[in-house]
Design a protein with these regions (language model features):
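Conserved substrate/cofactor phosphate-moiety recognition/catalytic segment
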Residues: 3-60
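Conserved beta-strand scaffold positions in the cores of enzyme catalytic domains, especially
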Residues: 9-10, 23, 98-102, 158-160
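Conserved nucleotide-binding/hydrolysis micro-motifs of P-loop NTPases
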Residues: 15-17, 29-30, 74-76, 104-109
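Short, amphipathic alpha-helical "lid/cap" segments that border enzyme active or binding sites
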Residues: 52, 56, 168-176
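Conserved phosphate-donor/acceptor-positioning beta-strand/loop module used by diverse small-molecule
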Residues: 92-115, 161
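Small-molecule kinase domains that catalyze NTP-dependent phosphoryl transfer to phosphate-bearing small molecules
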Residues: 116-171
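C-terminal alpha-helix
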Residues: 174-185
Length: 186
Protein backbone atom coordinates (compact mmCIF):
# COMPACT_ATOMS: atom_id res chain seq x y z
CA UNK A 1 0.00 0.00 0.00
CA UNK A 2 1.27 3.44 -0.92
CA UNK A 3 -0.46 6.34 0.77
CA UNK A 4 0.16 9.69 -0.89
CA UNK A 5 -0.57 12.42 1.62
CA UNK A 6 -0.28 16.14 1.19
CA UNK A 7 -1.39 18.41 -1.57
CA UNK A 8 0.76 17.74 -4.59
CA UNK A 9 -0.03 14.27 -5.83
CA UNK A 10 0.60 14.94 -9.53
CA UNK A 11 3.23 12.19 -9.50
CA UNK A 12 0.76 9.36 -8.86
CA UNK A 13 -0.14 8.36 -12.44
CA UNK A 14 3.52 7.98 -13.44
CA UNK A 15 4.35 6.08 -10.27
CA UNK A 16 1.26 3.92 -10.75
CA UNK A 17 2.34 3.14 -14.33
CA UNK A 18 5.84 2.19 -13.18
CA UNK A 19 4.56 -0.26 -10.57
CA UNK A 20 1.43 -1.79 -12.17
CA UNK A 21 -0.71 -1.01 -9.13
CA UNK A 22 -4.27 0.15 -8.58
CA UNK A 23 -5.12 3.74 -7.72
CA UNK A 24 -7.73 5.01 -5.28
CA UNK A 25 -7.48 8.77 -5.55
CA UNK A 26 -9.38 10.42 -2.72
CA UNK A 27 -11.46 12.25 -5.33
CA UNK A 28 -12.72 9.00 -6.92
CA UNK A 29 -15.04 8.17 -4.06
CA UNK A 30 -15.91 11.84 -3.60
CA UNK A 31 -16.85 12.33 -7.27
CA UNK A 32 -19.13 9.29 -7.24
CA UNK A 33 -20.72 10.08 -3.90
CA UNK A 34 -21.41 13.73 -4.75
CA UNK A 35 -23.56 12.60 -7.70
CA UNK A 36 -25.91 10.90 -5.25
CA UNK A 37 -25.88 12.99 -2.08
CA UNK A 38 -25.07 16.51 -0.98
CA UNK A 39 -21.77 16.76 0.89
CA UNK A 40 -23.63 17.90 4.01
CA UNK A 41 -25.88 14.82 4.12
CA UNK A 42 -24.85 12.00 6.48
CA UNK A 43 -25.44 9.50 3.66
CA UNK A 44 -22.64 11.18 1.72
CA UNK A 45 -20.11 10.37 4.44
CA UNK A 46 -21.41 6.83 4.92
CA UNK A 47 -21.22 5.99 1.21
CA UNK A 48 -17.86 7.69 0.72
CA UNK A 49 -16.28 5.76 3.59
CA UNK A 50 -17.97 2.49 2.55
CA UNK A 51 -16.49 2.76 -0.94
CA UNK A 52 -12.99 3.34 0.40
CA UNK A 53 -13.25 0.63 3.04
CA UNK A 54 -14.45 -1.91 0.47
CA UNK A 55 -11.60 -1.08 -1.91
CA UNK A 56 -9.08 -1.33 0.93
CA UNK A 57 -10.43 -4.71 2.05
CA UNK A 58 -10.48 -6.15 -1.47
CA UNK A 59 -6.92 -5.04 -2.18
CA UNK A 60 -5.58 -6.00 1.25
CA UNK A 61 -6.99 -9.53 1.04
CA UNK A 62 -6.63 -10.05 -2.70
CA UNK A 63 -3.69 -11.05 -4.86
CA UNK A 64 -2.91 -7.64 -6.32
CA UNK A 65 0.48 -6.00 -6.80
CA UNK A 66 -0.55 -3.01 -4.72
CA UNK A 67 -2.69 0.05 -4.25
CA UNK A 68 -1.94 3.75 -4.20
CA UNK A 69 -4.29 5.79 -2.03
CA UNK A 70 -4.08 9.57 -2.22
CA UNK A 71 -5.37 11.47 0.77
CA UNK A 72 -5.48 15.08 1.90
CA UNK A 73 -4.29 14.87 5.49
CA UNK A 74 -4.96 17.50 8.14
CA UNK A 75 -1.70 17.20 10.06
CA UNK A 76 -3.14 19.04 13.04
CA UNK A 77 -5.83 16.40 13.68
CA UNK A 78 -4.98 13.15 15.49
CA UNK A 79 -8.06 11.52 13.92
CA UNK A 80 -6.37 11.79 10.52
CA UNK A 81 -3.36 9.81 11.71
CA UNK A 82 -5.67 7.29 13.38
CA UNK A 83 -7.56 6.82 10.11
CA UNK A 84 -4.38 6.30 8.11
CA UNK A 85 -3.00 3.92 10.74
CA UNK A 86 -6.19 1.84 10.54
CA UNK A 87 -5.75 1.56 6.77
CA UNK A 88 -2.08 0.61 7.21
CA UNK A 89 -2.98 -1.95 9.90
CA UNK A 90 -5.49 -3.60 7.56
CA UNK A 91 -2.83 -4.07 4.89
CA UNK A 92 -0.12 -5.14 7.34
CA UNK A 93 -2.46 -7.75 8.84
CA UNK A 94 -2.51 -9.26 5.35
CA UNK A 95 1.31 -9.24 5.03
CA UNK A 96 1.51 -6.18 2.79
CA UNK A 97 4.25 -3.57 2.84
CA UNK A 98 3.00 -0.05 3.45
CA UNK A 99 4.65 3.20 2.43
CA UNK A 100 3.61 6.78 3.15
CA UNK A 101 4.73 9.48 0.73
CA UNK A 102 4.05 13.07 1.69
CA UNK A 103 4.11 15.34 -1.32
CA UNK A 104 4.08 19.08 -0.91
CA UNK A 105 4.27 22.06 -3.23
CA UNK A 106 4.10 25.81 -2.87
CA UNK A 107 0.54 27.14 -2.80
CA UNK A 108 1.00 29.10 -6.04
CA UNK A 109 2.15 25.94 -7.83
CA UNK A 110 -0.84 24.07 -6.44
CA UNK A 111 -3.12 26.74 -7.91
CA UNK A 112 -1.51 26.23 -11.32
CA UNK A 113 -1.84 22.44 -11.09
CA UNK A 114 -5.45 22.78 -9.97
CA UNK A 115 -6.26 24.15 -13.44
CA UNK A 116 -4.33 21.52 -15.41
CA UNK A 117 -6.10 19.71 -18.21
CA UNK A 118 -5.51 16.28 -16.66
CA UNK A 119 -6.86 17.32 -13.26
CA UNK A 120 -9.99 18.87 -14.75
CA UNK A 121 -10.54 15.83 -16.97
CA UNK A 122 -10.58 13.42 -14.02
CA UNK A 123 -12.07 15.58 -11.27
CA UNK A 124 -15.44 16.91 -12.31
CA UNK A 125 -16.01 18.87 -9.11
CA UNK A 126 -12.79 20.83 -9.74
CA UNK A 127 -14.07 22.23 -13.06
CA UNK A 128 -15.74 25.14 -11.32
CA UNK A 129 -12.40 26.91 -10.99
CA UNK A 130 -13.67 29.81 -8.90
CA UNK A 131 -15.21 27.45 -6.34
CA UNK A 132 -12.22 25.10 -6.45
CA UNK A 133 -9.68 27.84 -5.83
CA UNK A 134 -11.78 29.29 -3.01
CA UNK A 135 -12.05 25.81 -1.47
CA UNK A 136 -8.27 25.37 -1.71
CA UNK A 137 -7.72 28.67 0.07
CA UNK A 138 -10.29 27.91 2.76
CA UNK A 139 -8.90 24.42 3.39
CA UNK A 140 -5.32 25.69 3.53
CA UNK A 141 -6.32 28.30 6.11
CA UNK A 142 -8.36 25.88 8.22
CA UNK A 143 -5.98 22.89 8.29
CA UNK A 144 -2.25 22.23 8.35
CA UNK A 145 -1.85 20.28 5.12
CA UNK A 146 1.82 19.36 5.41
CA UNK A 147 4.13 18.23 8.18
CA UNK A 148 6.63 20.61 9.68
CA UNK A 149 10.24 20.22 8.59
CA UNK A 150 11.79 17.61 10.86
CA UNK A 151 8.46 16.63 12.40
CA UNK A 152 8.34 13.01 13.52
CA UNK A 153 5.38 11.18 12.01
CA UNK A 154 4.03 7.81 13.16
CA UNK A 155 4.76 5.96 9.93
CA UNK A 156 7.34 3.20 9.56
CA UNK A 157 8.12 3.73 5.86
CA UNK A 158 7.84 7.45 5.15
CA UNK A 159 9.34 10.08 2.89
CA UNK A 160 8.48 13.74 2.36
CA UNK A 161 9.15 15.30 -1.03
CA UNK A 162 8.69 18.92 -2.05
CA UNK A 163 7.76 18.51 -5.69
CA UNK A 164 7.15 22.20 -6.44
CA UNK A 165 9.81 22.21 -9.16
CA UNK A 166 10.08 18.48 -9.89
CA UNK A 167 8.61 16.58 -12.82
CA UNK A 168 6.40 13.58 -12.03
CA UNK A 169 9.05 11.21 -13.47
CA UNK A 170 11.65 12.60 -11.08
CA UNK A 171 9.41 12.20 -8.05
CA UNK A 172 8.40 8.67 -9.04
CA UNK A 173 12.08 7.74 -9.34
CA UNK A 174 12.86 9.33 -5.95
CA UNK A 175 10.12 7.26 -4.32
CA UNK A 176 11.24 4.04 -5.96
CA UNK A 177 14.87 4.68 -5.00
CA UNK A 178 14.08 5.66 -1.41
CA UNK A 179 12.05 2.51 -0.77
CA UNK A 180 14.22 0.26 -3.02
CA UNK A 181 11.25 -0.72 -5.16
CA UNK A 182 11.74 -2.10 -8.63
CA UNK A 183 9.57 -0.60 -11.30
CA UNK A 184 8.46 -1.57 -14.75
CA UNK A 185 11.17 -2.72 -17.12
CA UNK A 186 10.88 -0.63 -20.28
Amino acid sequence: LFIGIGRACIVVPKFQYNLFVGLLDIRMSIELTRKLFAHSEKEWSVLNETIRKTVFELFAKGDFPGLIFTYMCAFDMQSEFDYLQNVIDLFKSNDSNCYVVELCADFEERLVRNKSENRLLHKESKRNLEWSEAEMRKTSEKYRLNSYDGESLPFENYIKIDNTTLAPDEVAKMIQTHFAIEGRKE
